[in-house]
């Protein structure tokens, strides 16, 4: 058995290590999976330089974030912490990664995407390039996507032009009209189910293929979070399909974001002093019921790391 703190809801969990699969719900409180917790841990490290639980994130409304069909398990909390909005490809608020609004280009500090890029219409390079264009010069894309270690990316459908899905009995077919006007019919489709419902798998990435897409789009640094982080229940038994952070440039806080963090830190300091100085806490400390040391040490660690 192992114990961990879910970095999405902040609750303590105790579970068997074998139950910590990439997709299986393993937090008894919010139902988060290893994939979700790994994604949010990567986001925390990329923005704050340390692994914080989502409830511990400072409220920095001057940082603008974009979600691509993010799960409500963390999307709702991100909206409380940042100037963040979640979008979808099939319902409002809609964002077409193949053709994003021009006014939004270069306006986001971070983009969060989990299991999206394997579903975008070909060519996939168009979606990666537009994600790059949506970010500010110092922005970061944090994503997960299924990928294999060796080989090349496998595109399931080449030459898609005018296409759609058709239900024939109990089968779903993809029907495409090519550039030459020929009709193609594809069977044996693979669908994944996520926040937006069923989504057609367009490709199977390889690690090298995914890295190449990101670097060709312009990202200067691509980091795969291959290390486990048991404290958050992020245990990677496989070496594939791990969280990835792709930086457009060196991330830095704006003056507004820095002010937001400092103001919150000052309020935290004040509240901690008032709490530690209360009569009941001081009495409990003297009687051995309350230990202030961990609180004070954690407070100092956060100050030094920032």
Regions found by a protein language model. Name each.
Residues 110-116:
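A short beta-strand submotif of the Rossmann-like class I SAM-dependent methyltransferase core
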Residues 97-100, 116, 199:
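Generic anion/oxyanion-binding catalytic loop in active/binding sites
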Residues 4, 122-267:
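S-adenosyl-L-methionine-dependent methyltransferase catalytic module, highlighting the catalytic core
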């Amino acid at each position: 058995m192992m114990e961990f703190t879910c970095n999405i809801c902040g609750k303590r969990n105790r579970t068997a290590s074998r139950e910590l699969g990439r997709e299986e719900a393993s937090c008894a409180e919010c139902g988060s999976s290893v994939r979700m917790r790994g994604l949010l841990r990567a986001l925390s490290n990329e923005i704050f330089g340390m692994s914080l639980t989502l409830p511990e994130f400072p409220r920095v409304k001057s940082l603008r974030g974009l979600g691509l069909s993010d799960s409500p398990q963390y999307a709702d909390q991100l909206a409380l912490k940042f100037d963040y909005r979640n979008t979808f490809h099939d319902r409002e608020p809609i964002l077409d990664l193949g053709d994003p609004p021009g006014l939004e280009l270069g306006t986001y500090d971070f983009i969060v995407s989990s299991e999206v890029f394997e579903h975008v219409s070909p060519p996939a390079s168009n979606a990666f390039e537009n994600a790059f264009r949506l970010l500010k010069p110092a922005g970061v894309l944090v994503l997960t996507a299924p990928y294999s270690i060796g080989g090349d990316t496998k595109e399931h459908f080449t030459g898609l032009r005018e296409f759609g899905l058709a239900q024939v009995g109990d089968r779903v077919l993809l029907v495409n009209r090519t550039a030459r006007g020929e009709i193609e019919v594809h069977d044996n489709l693979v669908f994944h189910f996520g926040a937006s419902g069923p989504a057609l798998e367009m490709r199977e990435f390889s690690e090298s293929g995914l890295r190449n897409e990101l670097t060709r789009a312009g990202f200067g640094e691509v980091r795969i979070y291959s290390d486990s982080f048991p404290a958050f229940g992020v245990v990677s038994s496989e070496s594939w399909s791990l969280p990835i952070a792709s930086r457009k440039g060196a991330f830095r806080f704006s003056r507004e974001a820095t002010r937001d963090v400092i103001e919150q830190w000052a309020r935290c300091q004040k509240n901690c002093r008032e709490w530690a100085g209360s009569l009941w806490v001081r009495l409990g400390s003297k009687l051995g019921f309350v230990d202030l040391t961990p609180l004070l040490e954690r407070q100092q660690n956060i100050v030094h790391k920032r």
